Amino acid sequence: MHFEAYPPEVNSANIYAGPGPDSMLAAARAWRSLDVEMTAVQRSFNRTLLSLMDAWAGPVVMQLMEAAKPFVRWLTDLCVQLSEVERQIHEIVRAYEWAHHDMVPLAQIYNNRAERQILIDNNALGQFTAQIADLDQEYDDFWDEDGEVMRDYRLRVSDALSKLTPWKAPPPIAHSTVLVAPVSPSTASSRTDT
């Protein structure tokens, strides 16, 4: 989207009259909560594995640990990823706050246009031509300033989104070692039906 093509009234209104960052902050809190929950799951899973190592001995426990390794890595990566989502949401919120601070206030833009119209209406003898030109230059500056702010906002948001990686499905546990036989969908449904 080329924000530079929009007049300052549009860009400023989109920032000042928009929904604001509340929904993004709520999303960040939700991701943080999920991160805390999954970190607790990760720690519990690791404790369980350590308990099994203490209780068992021999090649079976080593086989179990090897089978669980991919899932442990996935769980660790998931927690990092959840934390990164929250962090990048806050980056997007900061980008919005900077844009909100730097955007030309709507009142300034409207005052410029209103004053210009008054001068045009009373410029029969050309006595206000210079002032009208000054107001037009100020309006052009508003246009450029708002376009630059929106460009920067877009770049900051794009940068934050680029740091988010696709979600990976959890790997199976113990499938390759045949410690736990894979359950087919038909078997799983028949077990739940009985």
From Swiss-Prot:
It comes from the Bacteria. Changing residue 124 to L: Does not disrupt the interaction with EspG5. GO terms for biological process: response to host immune response. GO terms for cellular component: cell surface; extracellular region. Pfam families: PPE (PF00823). It is found in: Secreted; Cell surface. Changing residue 130 to I: Does not disrupt the interaction with EspG5. Forms a heterodimer with PE25. The dimer forms a 1:1:1 heterotrimeric complex with EspG5. PPE41 interacts directly with EspG5. The PE25/PPE41 dimer induces both a strong humoral and cellular immune response. The dimer induces necrosis, but not apoptosis, in mouse macrophage cells. It also induces activation and maturation of mouse dendritic cells and drives Th2-biased immune responses. This is PPE family protein PPE41.
